[in-house]
Amino acid sequence: GRIISLAHPVAMGGCFLATLYAGYTGLQWRMLRELGVELKEARAAASAAQKAVQEHAGAGASDEEALAPPPPSLVQAASDADAVVASLTEKRSVIQAGNFRDRHYQLGTILLAVGIPMALEGPVNTYMRAGKLFPGPHVYAGVGVASLWAIAAALVPEMQKGKEWARTAHIGVNAVTFGLFAYYQIPTGLEIAAKVIEKTKFP
């Protein structure tokens, strides 16, 4: 029936949207980690700037010189460093509030639990209806998408160990997945869905 036949395109359309949002949440999570590194460096720079101001204030040969204010350049440098720390802290807090790490994990779980079974359901349903498969870009790209989802998930343990190569590979794999989805799966899938609607009846 039409409902069963359209289950695959509807589910895979949802998976495409989930892939887009997973990419967004993943990049936000990566940005959060990078901000943590930047914030650590900025705090060290701010501490060094404040120390320079304090050392200059106490470096005079006499009490009168010691009480002299530090040069404006040192004060400005310390102020600028503090401003950078404040800006990065605020930016990090905003991203943390988005809870992107957990969202990214949840979307990945959905793609594995729904996307891969539905990717298999498509050709199975076609074979049950037509008695044969129709090899072409849609089928080949679908196999590629499902395989790349599995590869991306397989990289997670190494990513959790802090391996940068795994993180880079994870991003690259998912970028290819998006390309296959957008360039092959969506256009060819819409054509197939139109034929299914034309040749089937409810339910």
Can you annotate each of these PLM segments?
Residues 1-203:
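Membrane-embedded alpha-helical bundles that constitute the cytochrome b-like, heme-associated redox core
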